[in-house]
Amino acid sequence: MRAMIAYMHWLSAGYEVGAKVKGQGLPKAQFLDRAANPKKGGEIYAAKCAACHGENGEGIKNEGFAQSGDYYTFPALWGDDSYNTGAGMYRLIEGARYVKATMPKGDASLSWEEAFDVTAYINSKPRKIKPDRKKDFPDLDVKQMDMDVGPYNDGF
């Protein structure tokens, strides 16, 4: 435990407590002047995502799972092994922010339009539904604007 704490102190040397570190977090979304287009997103997915996440969003399983403990080399993006409808990635804005900041892996070259479109495409696919989602937001004044759960108190 002491070694872990010493390592954490070493990592944070030169930073104020609570300071933002370059590369931390996701970029602020640059909204489109149009709706996200899942059809365009499907074309982007085929060209830039399917090689890693599978043609049908099934992901690529790790053949060495027993040794590594990592079930997927690249995660499933829809279907039973993917995130459910309560996950942050299922929210269009949050998902697009993540996609913009990280995809394709090692390149992060998608435009905001591409990020929104491919996120809309991915989230249009079947996945597990989180039960009782309305209970996630008993106070609608703090519900994120890109949640698909009504009633809507945010003008959208």
What are these regions (language model features)?
Residues 4, 41-56, 118-122:
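The canonical Cys-X-X-Cys-His
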Residues 1-20, 108-137, 141, 151:
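C-terminal capping alpha-helices of c-type cytochrome domains
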